[in-house]
Amino acid sequence: MQTVNVDIAIVGAGGGGLRAAIAAAEANPNLKIALVSKVYPMRTHTVAAEGGAAAVIKEEDSYDKHFQDTVAGGDWLCEQDVVEYFVQHSPVEMTQLERWGCPWSRKADGDVNVRRFGGMKIERTWFAADKTGFHLLHTLFQTSIQYPQIQRFDEHFVLDILVDDGHARGMVAMNMMEGSLVQINANAVVIATGGGCRAFKFNTNGGIVTGDGLSMAYRHGVPLRDMEFVQYHPTGLPNTGILMTEGCRGEGGILVNKDGYRYLQDYGLGPETPIGKPQNKYMELGPRDKVSQAFWQEWKKGNTLKTAKGVDVVHLDLRHLGEKYLHERLPFICELASAYEGVNPVNEPIPVRPVVHYTMGGIEVDFNSETRIKGLFAVGECASSGLHGANRLGSNSLAELVVLGRVAGEYAAQRAVEAQSVNQSAVDAQAKDVVARLEALHKQEGNESWSEIRDEMGTVMEEGCGIYRDQASMQKAVDKIAELKERYKRIRVSDNSSVFNTDVLYTVELGYILDVAQSIANSAIERKESRGAHQRLDYTERDDVNYLKHTLAFYNENGAPRIEYSPVKITKSQPAKRVYGAEAEAQEAAAKAKEQANG
C-alpha cells in the first residue's frame, strides 16, 4: 500500500471540498493538501445545481430579512448563530466568486441579476442562467489549480478515515484506475462528500452520492443530526427525477392540477397571483416542504394527472413566459424537458412530481464546521451545520458550500499546525484493518445481490419515510432496513478484477447508504410531531414543548442506532407560527403599521 503524507486531506472535490482546499491553501501556503475525489472534480454533484445561490444584494433587502426567512423556513430548528454568520458572509463569497471569474447573470444596467426563490420574501438568489452549479464549480476548480500545494487524487474511493486518540489522522483510499490502495496521513480531515438521498428510490442525486462521508464519521462515533428531515423538491421529471429548478417558478412558472387550477392557493400559499413574472412572494414560491405536501394532498383528492407510464404528476406551465425569455433565463430546462420528456416548454406544460432532493441532517458539526473528533471537519450536504433546520430554503445550499467551505478550510489549516505528535504505529494498524476488511469482502460467501438490496431499500424508504409518514409506515422501514443490513453481510462479490471494480465499489457504497437509511428511519420514528419536512399523519402539529431539539443518531454496530437529543441555539427569533400567503401578508402589514405608529 502506497503512503502519502500531507497536512490536510479533503474527501470530496465538489463545491465544498474545493472551497475548503482553496481556503486552507490561502491560510497557510506551506501546508500540503490532498484533495481526494471519487470522480474528476467537474463531474461532482455540485455541477447538477441549477437555480442559484442566496446572498443579500438589493437595497430593500437586509441580513435580518434573510435570517428571518431562513429560520422560519427551517421551522425554528436552525442554529441561529450559524444562520447569522451565513447571511452576513454570503455576499462576500458571491463577490469573491465573481472576482475569480464566475459569470453571474446581469441586468441591462450591468448589475448582478437576482431571482426569487421559494420561502424568500425578496429576490436574493444570484444565478448564472440555469447552470449555476456548473459555473460555480468551474470557477472554484480553475482557481484551485493555481495552488501547487493542492495535490489531487481523482478517481480515488475513500474506504475509511483514520483516527488516533480522538484526532483525525488521515484516510485509506482505493485508486480505482489501478486497483491499488493508498494511505494518506494527515493532521486534519475535511469531509465534503454530499448527502444521502440515494437511500430513496426516486431522487435527484447522481450515482456517486451514496452517503460515504456520513457513514464514515458515523462509524467513528460522530452522531448524525436531524436525519429525519429529508427534502422533497416539488418539481422533478417523472421518469428520471431530473430537477426542474425552482428558478422556473422564480421566473414566473405556475403549477396546475388536472383541471388547470392553481391549487397552491388552497394550502395556505395564496392568494392567487397574476400569471406572468410574479410580484407576489408566495403561491408557487412557497417553501419546498409546503409545495410538496400540497402535491400529496392533490394526489389524495384525485386531482393529479397520469403519465403514459401511470405516474401521478401535475403541470409546470412556463408557456406564458415566451420563447425568448425562456431561452435566455432557462435554456437548460428547455433542453432537459425536451430530451427526457419530449416536451417543448415554449408550447407545452412540463409534467412534474416531487422528488427526494436534499438531506437537511448530516454529520454534527459546531460553529467552526468541526465534529466531536478533533481535526475532523464536514461541510456541505453531508454536514449538519444547523443552517437549514427542518427545511432548507432553495439557493441557501450553494451559498453554504462556499461560506462554510471557507470556514472548514481555514480551521482545518489551524488544526493541522496545532496537531500533537501522532502514534503512527496505531494509525498504520488501523489502515491495515481497513485493507483486511476489504479483502474479507472479496472472500465473503453468500447469495445476496447488492442491486436487489439497494432496490428494496429505496422502495421501503419511499413508502415509509415519504412526504407524509405515520408510525406504521416508519416501523416498516425500520424493520426492513435492519433486515437488509443483515442480508448485506451475505453479499457475494463476484468480480475479482482490480481496475475499476464496480462490483466492489457498489457493495461498499451500499454499506454506507444503508447506514444513512437506518439513521433516517430510526430518527424519524422517534420524532412524534410534524415539523418542516417531517410530516406525520398521526402527529399533525408542531410540538415545541417536547421536540424543539435536534435528534442525534449514534452508530451501533450490532443493531439500531442510539437516539439522543441536543438543544437548539436560539439567538433572536423565538418559535412562532409559520405563515405564508395572505396570512403572512396581513402579518407583515400589521408589523409595518405598528412600526410607523411608533415612528
UniProtKB/Swiss-Prot annotation:
Cofactor note: Binds 1 FAD covalently per subunit.
Entry keywords, A to Z: Cell inner membrane, Cell membrane, Electron transport, FAD, Flavoprotein, Membrane, Nucleotide-binding, Oxidoreductase, Transport
Classification via Pfam families: FAD_binding_2, Succ_DH_flav_C
UniProt modified residues of type Tele-8alpha-FAD histidine: H45
Residues that hold FAD according to the record: 12-16, 36-38, 44-52, 156-158, 212, 357-358, 381, 392-398
Cofactor(s) listed in the protein's UniProt record: FAD
Top-rank lineage group of the source organism: Bacteria
Catalytic reaction(s) noted: a quinone + succinate = fumarate + a quinol; a menaquinone + succinate = a menaquinol + fumarate
Residue numbers annotated as active site: H233, R249
EC number: 1.3.5.1
GO molecular function, one term: flavin adenine dinucleotide binding
GO biological process: anaerobic respiration; electron transport chain; fermentation
Principal location: membrane
Gene Ontology CC annotation, any one: plasma membrane
Gene3D superfamilies assigned to the protein according to its UniProt record, in alphabetical order: FAD/NAD(P)-binding domain, Fumarate reductase/succinate dehydrogenase flavoprotein-like, C-terminal domain, succinate dehydrogenase protein domain, Succinate dehydrogenase/fumarate reductase flavoprotein, catalytic domain
Enzyme class: oxidoreductase
PROSITE patterns reported in the protein's UniProt record: FRD_SDH_FAD_BINDING (PS00504)
Locations listed in the record: Cell inner membrane
Family recorded in the similarity comment: Belongs to the FAD-dependent oxidoreductase 2 family. FRD/SDH subfamily.
NCBIfam families per the UniProt record, alphabetical: fum_red_Fp, PRK09231.1, sdhA_frdA_Gneg
Quaternary structure and partners: Part of an enzyme complex containing four subunits: a flavoprotein (FrdA), an iron-sulfur protein (FrdB), and two hydrophobic anchor proteins (FrdC and FrdD).
Listed name of the protein: Fumarate reductase flavoprotein subunit
Native organism: Haemophilus influenzae (strain ATCC 51907 / DSM 11121 / KW20 / Rd)
UniProt lineage: Bacteria, Pseudomonadati, Pseudomonadota, Gammaproteobacteria, Pasteurellales
